[in-house]
Amino acid sequence: MNLSQYLTPLEDEMRAVVAPLAESSPALLYGMLRYHLGWADEAFHPVQVYAGKRLRPCFLLLACEAQGGPWREALPAAAAIELLHNFTLIHDDIEDHDARRRGRPTLWTLWGVPQAINAGDALFALAYRAMLRLDAGPLPPDRILLALRRYSKAILYITEGQCFDLAFEAQEEVAETPYLQMIERKTAVLLGLACELGGLLAGAA
C-alpha cells in the first residue's frame, strides 16, 4: 500500500477546481485560498509548503480501489473532501482564536476575521464545485446523486460537532456521552465519509 501515489493527482485535481478562479477578481479572495492551501506566501507569490497529510482524500481513493473501482474516477470527490476539511479549519481557527496553522499565520490573523470567514465560505462552495466534477466522468448519475446526499449529511454533522465543541469551552466538566457525540461528528465524520464515498463511487452497496 502506497498512499503517495494519490498525492500528485489529488493536488492536480484541487488546483483544477481553484486555480482557474485565481486569476479573476477579487484577487485577495483567491490569494487567501491559495495561501491557506499551501500554494502561495503572504504576498501571494507561488510556493509549495506543507499543507497537511491529506489523509481523508487518500482514504477515499484507497477505499475506492479496495472495492475494485478506478480510483482516478473518484478524484473529484477526494478533492472535495480535502477542500471541505480546509474550510472547517479556516472557521475553526477563527472560533478557537488559533494564530498559527501548519507553521504559518492563520488567515484571520493576516487579513482579519471578516475576510477569513468569507474565504472559508468560498472554500465551502468550491468543495461542492469539486464534487460536481464527478458528473464529467463515467459514473452513473444516480451514484453521484447518492454521493452528494451523503456528503451534505456529513456537513451537517460537522456543524453539530463544532456546536458541541464550542459549548464545551464554557463548561468546567463535560460528560462522556456529549463528548463522544462531539468527536463522532467533528473528528470521525469526515474520515468515515471519505471511506464511505470511496466505496460508494466504486459501486459498493
Predicted region positions:
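Active-site alpha-helical segments that house and flank conserved acidic catalytic motifs
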Residues: A74-D98, R149, I155-Y157, A188-G192, ...
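Mid-bilayer segments of alpha-helical transmembrane spans in multi-pass integral membrane proteins
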Residues: P114, N118, A154, I158-Q162
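Conserved N-terminal diphosphate/IPP-binding helix and adjacent helical/loop segment
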Residues: M1-A80, L84, I90, I94-T109, ...
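Inter-helical turn/loop segments and adjacent helix faces that build the functional surface
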Residues: A66-P70, A130-L148, D165-M182, E196-A205
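Divalent-cation-assisted or electrostatically stabilized phosphate/pyrophosphate-binding catalytic cores
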Residues: Q48, R101-L123, E172-T187
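Short amphipathic alpha-helical segments with heptad-repeat character
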Residues: M1-S4, S152, E184
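A glycine/threonine-rich phosphate-anchoring loop and its flanking beta-alpha core
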Residues: L110-W111, I117, D121-L139, R149
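Residue-level signal for inorganic ion chemistry
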Residues: F59, A127, G161
